[in-house]
Amino acid sequence: MQISAKESFFRHQCLLFLDIVNGSIYERELIGILSGDMKQVEKFSRAVPPERKESVLGLIRHPFFVTRSAGSLGADVVALRGDLSAIIEVKSSISDSIMFTEASGKRQEQATRMIKRLEASGTFLMYAYRLKGIRGEAWKTFAAPANPKGKIAYLYDFLPKLDTTRENNFYLKWERGKPLSEFIDYMNRLQSD
């Protein structure tokens, strides 16, 4: 069955809308976890390995201050706690990899722009990637290339880096990320020293 160009365009727009809506759902989920929302933290804690469950539940007592970033020029989420911060770009997909050159290369441009902006501040851009439709812990974390200064450099060294293609374009491979529960546990240990 042949569909018209108009119908094809409409279907494409609907898929884009659903992706945007779903993306914001997962962004709110991450914000709820990091900000210590009891319902979100308890739900997330059921998916993490037993050895990290206590660390995750500790977010209820010792949460991050989390805010959403406005507009498309900044990262999605900024999480602050004590003397550490995380500038986070949230990604979600049913695919286990995300190529930054997809969507007309806008992801690549955004990442490059953010990396340059954060370089002067001595911090780095972090990616939180949620794989849709998976049982268990669905969030993985990554760091964009940087040269951070101070205590935040320990966190940077702990996180796996974005992969790059031969053409130096970024991509995320979900299985190579560090589970969000490990990120939380490591932040707790960094701040207890």
Task: Pin down the residues of each PLM region.
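Active-site beta-strand-loop-beta-strand hairpin of nuclease catalytic cores
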Residues: 71-92
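A short catalytic or substrate-binding loop motif that flags glycine-/basic-rich loops and adjacent residues
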Residues: 69-72, 120
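Acidic-basic catalytic patches of nuclease active cores, encompassing PD-(D/E)XK
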Residues: 1-69
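Intrinsically disordered, low-complexity terminal regions enriched in charged/polar residues
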Residues: 136-193
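Short amphipathic alpha-helical segments and helix-helix/interface helices
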Residues: 31, 111-118
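Mg2+/Mn2+-dependent nuclease catalytic core
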Residues: 93-114
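Nucleic-acid nuclease catalytic cores
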Residues: 115-149
